[in-house]
Design a protein with these regions (language model features):
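Generic structural signal for coil-to-beta-strand starts
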Residues: 22-24
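Surface-exposed, charged, gly/pro-rich loop-and-adjacent secondary-structure segments at domain edges
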Residues: 26-125
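Short, surface-exposed charged micro-motifs
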Residues: 13-15, 105
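Short, mixed charged/polar active-site loops
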Residues: 5-8, 33-35
Length: 134
């Protein structure tokens, strides 16, 4: 969480992410090895240093942290859950072609509805998506 960070920080940049029309720089905090994402816009101020880091050494940690997020928002409690959400057939069938999360799995239920299985954290984006879906 950002309240534990002391600015300025050093981020080891891993990649650029395009999410919902915005471009982000994603990487790990040099000290805590925490996943950080910053939107690249006119308000972002950064300094490029000459320091180097071993990308291969931290890639596994980066991929693990990013893969547990539903979207790019931070988890509310830094935990990963097995989430099951039941949707009516019509709604579920319209949602199946979207890429919600890499763990997504749909299961047809005996009543004709579908159960969405996810293995990820709960954050602002998931809560917002569920509110809109209801």
């Amino acid at each position: 969480k950002f309240d534990k960070l002391i600015f300025p920080i050093t981020i080891n940049p891993m990649e650029l992410l395009f999410h919902e029309g915005r471009l982000y720089i994603a990487g790990l905090d040099d000290k805590a090895k925490q996943l950080l994402l910053f939107v690249i816009d006119k308000n972002l101020i950064f300094t490029i240093s000459k320091s180097v880091f071993n990308r291969k050494k931290i890639l596994g940690n980066y991929v693990k942290q990013l893969s547990h997020r539903f979207g790019i928002s931070s988890a509310i409690d830094n935990k990963v859950y097995n989430i099951k959400i039941e949707f009516a057939r019509g709604y579920a069938e319209s949602m199946m072609n979207f890429s919600w999360h890499n763990s997504k799995r749909w299961q047809e239920l005996p009543n004709g509805n579908y159960l969405l299985h996810l293995h990820c954290s709960i954050g602002r984006e998931m809560i917002g998506w569920l509110v809109l879906a209801s």
